[in-house]
Amino acid sequence: MARERREIKRIESAAARQVTFSKRRRGLFKKAEELSVLCDADVALIVFSSTGKLSHFASSSMNEIIDKYNTHSNNLGKAEQPSLDLNLEHSKYAHLNEQLAEASLRLRQMRGEELEGLSIDELQQLEKNLEAGLHRVMLTKDQQFMEQISELQRKSSQLAEENMQLRNQVSQISPAEKQVVDTENFVTEGQSSESVMTALHSGSSQSQDNDDGSDVSLKLGLPCGAWK
């Protein structure tokens, strides 16, 4: 005949509770000892009765098992902290992915893509955004044009000023210096200084010959009476 299954609930009688506690405590400690022997496990049991009486069992040293438990609990807490950090990073990553997807969608809509699901208000807002963006582009373009024009005007003024300075320097050169400058220019155009001096000497000789010829012609032109 099968034993009737007893309902697990608090025993109301204090005496019956104490008897049941004593019997089941011995059975619990026996099972713990068997588990430690069969499985080579460190087992520790600490039990307080309803009256506050302490009962304990340890397969080895209770203090050693408790120290091992505390060490394991501390290490477990440290190991769980990176897991929490990893969950936080994963949450941030998911949030950034959502923001990236929204920004990509807005960019495609700015290009005129994927507009089918937008309402009239959303389309009007998109139109305003496009107009504002176009206005900023035009302002930036005009600003760059003005900067380029100002730079060209500055360079033109600088060249004009340098040209004026050169003109002033040339106007201050004396005629003799101008002749030297012209001679130097003549030399640089392909003739040596010796050829220049030869040309100048031949010119002076021709001038002297012309003067002598003039004297002869004048002497020949005198009347015969003047010779006496």
From Swiss-Prot:
More details: Plants over-expressing MADS22 produce shortened panicles and stems.
Locations listed in the record: Nucleus
Function: Probable transcription factor. May be required for spikelet (rice flower) development. Transcription factor that functions to support the MADS55 in its function as negative regulator of brassinosteroid signaling.
Name of the gene: MADS22
Identification of the protein by name: MADS-box transcription factor 22
Record lineage: Eukaryota, Viridiplantae, Streptophyta, Embryophyta, Tracheophyta
Phenotype of the disrupted gene, per the record: No visible phenotype under normal growth conditions.
Main location: nucleus
PROSITE patterns per record: K_BOX, MADS_BOX_1, MADS_BOX_2
Organism: Oryza sativa subsp. japonica
Keyword flag Chloroplast: no
Tissue and organ distribution: Expressed in palea and stamen primordia. Expressed in shoots and coleoptiles.
Pfam family, one: SRF-TF
K-box domain span: 86-176
Top-rank taxon: Eukaryota
GO CC field: nucleus
Biological process (GO), any one: flower development
GO MF term set: DNA-binding transcription factor activity, RNA polymerase II-specific; protein dimerization activity; RNA polymerase II cis-regulatory region sequence-specific DNA binding
